Curated annotation (Swiss-Prot):
Belongs to the DXR family. The lineage of its organism: Bacteria, Pseudomonadati, Pseudomonadota, Gammaproteobacteria, Lysobacterales. This is 1-deoxy-D-xylulose 5-phosphate reductoisomerase. Its EC number is 1.1.1.267. It is an enzyme of class 1 (oxidoreductase). Mn(2+) binds at D155, E157, E227. NADPH binds at T15, G16, S17, I18, G41, N129, E131, G211. The gene is dxr.
Amino acid sequence: MAGSSLRQVAVFGATGSIGASALDVIARHPERLRASVLSAGSKVEDLLALCAAHRPAHAVIADAALYPALRDGLRALGLATQAHAGAEALDALAGSDACDTVVAAIVGAAGLPSTLAAARAGKRLLLANKESLVLAGELLTRTATAAGAEIIPIDSEHSAIFQCLRSCDAGRGVRRVILTASGGPFRGRDRAALAAVTPAQAVAHPKWSMGPKISVDSATLMNKGLEVIEAHHLFGLPGEQIDVLVHPQSLVHSLVEFVDGSTLAQLGLPDMRTTLAVGLAWPERVESGVGGLDLLSQGRLDFEAPDTAAFPCLRLAWDALRAGGTAPAVLNAANEVAVSAFLQGQVGFLAIPALVEHALTTLPRHNADTLDTLLFADAQARQVTERALAHHALHA
């Protein structure tokens, strides 16, 4: 981007942890990056504080009832930032000339429409919303290709693969990719010990600072399962060419093995600002605020196979990928409902994979031809899982 104009960046999900990391990187490079659009779900006060700090042209609150609070708050701050509310406003801005780059960091299936809108408009899409790929990966990648949109993954694992693959003309020379997993806070525990896990314990991740939903997904290994499905869509690889290794130090973010016997790995400290800096500046490199990796002080790098008996969510994700069609959408939706119930104390930790498996075995698989089909599968999976929860409550 040397000598070019400012990159106009929309940060969707600005009040979350990924949004904060993105804004940190953007603020370090005022000569090349500008936060032009900021969005939040319902945290209007947090959004106003971010607007005061970054002075975007547009601010969006997803909860339309909070529009007056956002509008009046911006006026009170003396900001020229234009207030918007609702999902339609978000989608419109994603596709408008208000931005050329979108950081898609809205959690859950709610982030899909704006992600698709950005892809349709040919934007550079920094994808942190894994549900977009899991729910509608085929549709999203097809849309992006047709419109010339560039998808750069922000997950540390997929960013690592992206960087390794872009280091050469890989073509058909990839034998397999290996995603690494920290193993979560309960690595090494058996199912009996996992039965007693509390929500507070599950959200305390040993390596990464994350929101509650993704922290639980990391603890169940569903996060890694979703990443396997993502990798399939991002890099065009079948499930048989995607492996997972548990790596407790979280320093090797992923590896790519080539047909000539070479293996490339990307290493770095566990900080999302690195991958966001990659996405914001690619193919250039810019300062992210993250220090270098001192391997001597780290001491050792350990690797082990994931325990899919204790953590069946990873196996369920592979099953859904093999089934194809709407199965990944069902997996994702059932998991969202199950994790929410666990965080609210309605069910135990082991109920999460049980509820997901129930939805996968109950609902028929359909071809994932349209967004409507996928959203219908998503809604069905939520209903089936909610009914299973109600049944659980009656018999608890």
